[in-house]
Design a protein with these regions (language model features):
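C-terminal structural segment of proteins
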Residues: 1-170
Length: 170
């Protein structure tokens, strides 16, 4: 794995300053399960120079209703969403989706933000050392489109005036 700087942000303000300072050279993590594996296997088209960890920031793990909106903090674990009484009563589809996401271990550790921001699940994308330089990595081709793609997204499988890609919805 290439070297990178790791910042443990103590506050939202500190995280925002680091994001502003490093811009596109940085990635925000709260555990980094997804991105660290990609970095280790040299999968990313551009390797981040900085990882900004927000895991220790207080107050980012909440579920609350405000007016007609449900607000969920970035660090709220999937299991907490699945078990929350308010979510189960007023937003049962969300509770069910959270309860069926991944394995129990991942639900206990994984956050809603990490789940939303996780990278593409396409096995062509995940081949180590960028052996398949696909559209998602800046290439010109989607290998899953004509290859083995039975577990890929049905959304975005064709694009107007562009090469098809089946990776729209990880």
């Amino acid at each position: 794995m290439k070297r990178f700087k790791h910042i443990n942000a103590a506050s939202s303000e500190e995280a925002a300053l680091a994001i502003e300072q490093y811009g596109s050279k940085a990635k925000v993590i709260a555990g980094g399960t997804d991105i660290l594996g990609q970095m280790k296997d040299n999968i990313l088209p551009e390797y981040p120079e900085v990882l900004i960890n927000i895991k220790k920031i207080d107050g980012l793990d909440y579920i609350r209703e405000e007016g007609n909106s449900l607000k969920i903090g970035a660090l709220t674990r999937l299991e907490d969403i699945a078990r929350n009484k308010l979510v189960k009563k007023r937003y049962p589809a969300l509770a069910e989706a959270a309860a069926k996401t991944a394995s129990p271990h991942i639900r206990e550790q994984g956050t809603i933000a990490g789940n939303i921001c996780q990278s593409n699940r396409c096995w062509y994308y995940w081949v180590p050392d960028n052996r398949f330089y696909c559209i998602r990595k800046g290439g010109k081709r989607c290998y899953a489109y004509a290859g083995e793609g039975r577990y890929h997204s049905i959304f975005g499988s064709t694009r107007v005036n562009d090469t098809p890609c089946v990776s729209e919805c990880p």
